[in-house]
């Protein structure tokens, strides 16, 4: 399929503009080295670990959700153990975010049309942020990547990827 750059810099293509079956992946597999010895995802926010706060926030959206976690046993597993989302650890996560991303994309069910990437350490994200991103996808359905913007117009999260981008994830590193 022919691809071109849109006026906003997103890669666009023709085809299946109406199909929308997203999967959210919450990235929580990192080592949290910069905060050592503390694990920032286990720090309390409103009386519960930040990771649990984020997972519950994402569950409000009613989209299938996967949380990528460090290998068990790890306290992060306990923080989300009773929540109705898929919890998984990928060996590739030892490589960093790119390894987790490669593994998660390869693990997506074939029915998933879009991947929504969410970092677990963004407590200010709210369901309205996802609603706006998904509406942006509807309005600009011929794009392949949709990225949220911060209030000052800088790229932010969450980010949404069309399935046509999934093969490229197999090549990422770093």
Give short role names for the model-derived ranges.
Residues 4, 8-24, 166-174:
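Conserved alpha/beta core of the MobA/IspD/sugar-nucleotide pyrophosphorylase nucleotidyltransferase superfamily
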């Amino acid at each position: 399929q022919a691809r071109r750059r849109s006026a906003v810099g997103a890669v666009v293509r023709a085809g299946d503009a109406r199909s929308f079956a997203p999967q959210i992946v919450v990235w929580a597999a990192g080592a949290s080295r910069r905060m050592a010895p503390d694990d920032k995802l286990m720090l309390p926010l409103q009386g519960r670990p930040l990771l649990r706060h984020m997972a519950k926030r994402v569950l409000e959206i009613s989209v299938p959700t996967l949380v990528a976690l460090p290998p068990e046993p790890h306290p992060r597993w306990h923080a989300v153990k009773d929540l109705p989302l898929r919890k998984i650890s990928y060996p590739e996560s030892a490589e960093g975010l790119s390894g987790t991303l490669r593994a998660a994309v390869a693990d997506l069910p074939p029915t998933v049309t879009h991947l929504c990437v969410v970092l677990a350490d963004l407590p200010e994200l709210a369901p309205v942020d996802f609603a706006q991103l998904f509406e942006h996808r509807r309005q600009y359905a011929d794009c392949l990547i949709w990225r949220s913007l911060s209030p000052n117009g800088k790229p932010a999260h969450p980010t949404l990827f069309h399935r046509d981008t999934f093969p490229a994830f197999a090549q990422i590193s770093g």
